[in-house]
């Protein structure tokens, strides 16, 4: 493919990404893969170049553009040499005078008032920097120092005692340490959420929104003698956990829940859990550096829906915590409505509960929780709070 043809291909891919973001369809990665499966003539250099163009355009545009062409025209505004490719054979049509171009922005304009007040303008760029690859060592089987010997490019993560940081383009799925269940891919921020739970041998722990089980596995590694129940309403995600647990040597019970009947399906855990972790569904605004198109998918209506889900999950979790037990709430979000404001709302309705400072390194106090961000902590952005039920 010529450079002009690559540019045209990027426009075609971005058209699909824009439509998919609007309609809550497949992510950009999947769209790029599908595009080239249908075009076997494209070589590896072509695929790499088109993918890079697509994600540069996505990172540049905070708002969902009207079209893939608008996204690329906007990118060309920043890189004048690219304009020369418009109008070339197999390339896009020439740019017209005054043609609409996607504006450059870090975040959607409508979201700015929703940000935590701790987020300064100077942190916006870090929200979209490429994230490193973080590993979590399975400390039930090995130590970080021992595992680090097998990763010459790795360094200890500064905040999590379990973490190893690798360059962003590292591959680990074929590494002997991965095959042996000694490491899992997990951002340092997610590791800190597990640390905030302070799991102990003998604890009864419920991971209410376990997904594919990354944090449940971290809890099991930190406290092999704990009894862990991992639940979720997404069958596809939860079904991945048993194989992961087997590889890690972890004993974790899984249970598929059916909203809105979660409490009935968890009756055997009511007021019996030492720890309940609510790693709630959220806007994903803290993970934009890994998923920049998430900015294109989020709308005010979707944010309202997810905030309501978070409120409901917190209320369910409160019913499971034993007297004297602890509830840990976390979201990979930098928006106040999903973080500090959620805890304020919960405590308004549960005034006897006690707010505790999560026992983690890093972050800044944000209401009655802590906020970590890429710009301040070099982790994904997330909010975490810990609450204790009165005895």
Residue positions per predicted region:
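S-adenosylmethionine
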Residues: 1-391
